[in-house]
């Protein structure tokens, strides 16, 4: 639908002749002097021009700069976004290039790929609410706190975090990943660091994670060195047994592996046996991708099995019966190899970290909103949804209060469009200084003020794994089957304010909610391959969930009522769409033991509101059975 004409290198006498405000000036206006461009003419009436320029009043020169059509879209180079390089003296906080969109990327790709009618796996929402999850990396576990009210006690930063940001918030689950080297007495652990770890990880709203054993900082170099060492160690081992190996195959290995001298190989083997041989644990290097060393702890040589499986096994040994590590929280550059990713799968845990999403006055663009993760071989590394305090404090060197500005990112990624869940991600060293601790507490207070559905960090990672694995099969007009979705239980339809779930032709659907012009459809985790059917919006024929703080499952419609399981954190607030003025009896049981019974009446709008109640913290992971029974009688 387009024809390319001449290149226009000089544009001083050109001006914008057409501009679609829904597409252009999204985050930044075009400069007064237009960038050079390839002149393009539409030759299909179905092509929609969103931006065009012409020379003076010569209409024949008009060139399309941004267009969409039935076969795709086109945007001229230089007209999509503004970007600069960072200054050489830029700090860790503002060292990124400035970047802002001229075009609206959401609108551009919506029209380019005609996605309005396409169901989208959604990773921001569960049971109609924005997801909340939190995780803490173990860095700074043993740091002696400088927080005023604890300074004289010699208390560790980890215990301050336990007392101030974990124990007082049983309604907000958190995943804690210690560095095993901070706890293991053979490394740098002691009885006190172990005691604090056991106290933290025993809490029922705390999920156990691992932040590795030695806290690798430069995963890329370590992975390369590990491959090299494996080849060299194999050569050294077998050459001592068979002389012919050294005489015939050693030159071959030397060529392909670039092996070190015999003395260096012996020193490496000695370092394996001697913990004090720290200088032999890694190759010498002065600077590694922003870090002055390869690992935080170089007491022993790098061992991928120890970093992943070993750290998980050690932390599992600190947990109460029935509890296990669920998540590997990547360290350092977070640029892991496929072998590292595979090790997490072999250990039976999810993974998270990387991404560093910011959207605030310092990083004022959707460009700094990171993707869900990255592909590593046949695996996916799951990114954290928000950045941690490192990027706000210049790697914990200044502006210790800076993490309080996370709230700006949380607001910008929720409105005008929800693009990320609420993720509170920080380190144990936030318990070291007063302003750092206060920043975390302010973010926790903000979380309590919001309408959220709290989940654990490993549950969020499972949701994103489901995004990557899900298969959506169209099985009819406005009807789809969702397969292989792992932990993902929300499907979103955009531009859908006039559509609704067709309950008679759907299976395994719990509820729906209209929000920001999109329709969020909640799926039942207990149904393996749910079916979603849509119809034009009209009053529903069955009660359905609008939103809930607690995720629910195993929904069954039974005569004049329904039953389901629910589990969550904090007050179990829920809203259901029913008949106007309908009266319900709500019964709650834990196993076969009745817990609570109450009555609630729907409003004139048919919305039934009730709260199951604060769950005892000791039962935070145990589901309850809920029955809704409509009863006769006037309210």
Question: PLM features: what roles do these ranges have?
Answer:
Residues 216-320, 372-414:
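Alpha-helical scaffold elements lining the catalytic groove of polysaccharide deacetylases
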Residues 454-635:
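Non-catalytic C-terminal accessory domains or segments of carbohydrate-active enzymes
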Residues 68-177, 434-465, 531-562, 567-568, ...:
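Extracellular ligand-binding/catalytic regions of CAZymes and related secreted enzymes
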Residues 108-128, 160-179, 184, 205, ...:
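C-terminal domain-boundary segment and adjacent tail
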Residues 1-59, 487-489, 495-497:
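An acidic, glycine-rich "communication" segment
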Residues 59-73, 123, 410-414:
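Short, surface-exposed beta-strand/loop micro-motifs that present aromatic residues
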Residues 95-219, 233-242, 246, 301, ...:
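Active-site beta->alpha N-cap acidic-glycine motif
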Residues 188-189, 299-378, 437, 606-613, ...:
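Catalytic domains of cell-wall/extracellular-matrix polysaccharide-remodeling enzymes
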